[in-house]
Amino acid sequence: LNDRWPNCINNLDTKESLSTQIAPCLTRETSPIWMDSSTSTECREIAEAVGGDSIVCSKSGSIAIERFTGPQIRRFYKTSPEAYSQTARIHLVSSFLCSVLCGVDAPIDTGDGAGMNLVNIHEWNWDADLLEATAPELIKRLPQIAKGCTTAGQISDYFVQKYGFASGTPITVFTGDNPSSLVGMGASKPGKLVISLGTSDTFFAAMPGVVADPQGCGHVFGNPAGGSMSLQCFVNGSLAREEVKDKFGYDWGQFTAALINTPAGNNGKIMVPFFRPEISPRVDLKAPILNGSDAFKSWQDADAAIRACVEGQFINMKLRTDWMQLEPEVIYLTGGASKNDAIAQVAADVFQAKVQRLAVSGSVALGASLRAASHSLGLDLDEMQGQFCKPEAGSTIEPKAPSDAYNSASKVFEGLLRKR
């Protein structure tokens, strides 16, 4: 955005569209999206400038990531130096929309802001070393960083006059989809984990303190409800489960029966269930690793292979998230596979915590609504989450396996990865 930006949003004309009025403020016609991965060179440059990936991770909560804002800004500066020089303000989508709604230049919150490789997670402010490594004079182009409980401003007259909003309505600073979802799922305090079982599996939770992943696979963000939160993605999610199911020509009913008919621990038969390169941990496998009987290793034991796949996924998930120092009281499962009680039972057994399915839909929007009601109206967030973020009735699954059931399997799993 150029230097016309502040005056533009403060003087929006209801007779004109937002796009017509804001377009002249843009210093680039297109913006990269979250799937862009063209900035590998810039990631290396940023890491080298500050002393390596581990330093970037310890400072920002993540290693330098291609789709994160910092590397994208560096590429913009390198490829379009003139446009960069004309840029007076750089916003995330969340803070940009918040600014438009308020009619003032809004801050970036610690939740969405931590996904930039620019924010120091120990101070929750811009990190001078990372800014310098990214682009010149970047600090003057960035808005302030603010916690999620910050009032960004009041509703702009544009929206009052054009759409009938109540004048003086306070606007709570916007955040990203994952931090907002954490609140909307009722998991904004430590002790509650959320595991989303989808094409990729995602694990996120409120953290009791601020600590970065020493392996550089996970991410740390600001928790909009206060403190910090973690997020970690696992590429080999539902697609891996489907690969094993299809390998034996099973349907989902037979898949479930296989889990029910095999014991926790799978009699020592273990699978590293990576059918494609994984990011947690970062390994370039194209096929699973199997350890056990000859029949099992040659894919002749269908039921054991199915249990090994699901157990391997949750064992890997627990191993990769131990750095978060969590003591889960409950795991909230969401996503398509969460409906499967047999899969949920494996999660309960591996993590030694009760599992519940969430009945929440639209958790991102719900989280935003709960935050606004808590911050602006003074309503108790815990009470509202208890009312609006209830688990499905009768969905609680308690662990059945003994607490040490997966100790040996976890060690073997790690050994298989080291030997690959």
Predicted feature residues:
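Small/polar loops that bind or transfer phosphate-bearing groups
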Residues: W34-M35, K147, Q232, G335
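A short, surface-exposed helix-loop junction/capping segment
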Residues: P107-G111
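Gly/Ser/Thr-rich loops at beta-strand to alpha-helix junctions
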Residues: L1, S338-K339
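A conserved helix-loop-beta module that forms one wall/lid of the active-site cleft
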Residues: A135-K147
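Active-site core segments that coordinate phosphate-bearing ligands/cofactors
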Residues: S40, R44-I63, R67-A106, N117-E137, ...
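A generic structural signal for short
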Residues: Q144, Y332-L333
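Glycine-rich phosphate-binding loop of ATP-grasp-fold ATP-dependent ligases
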Residues: E29, D112-L118
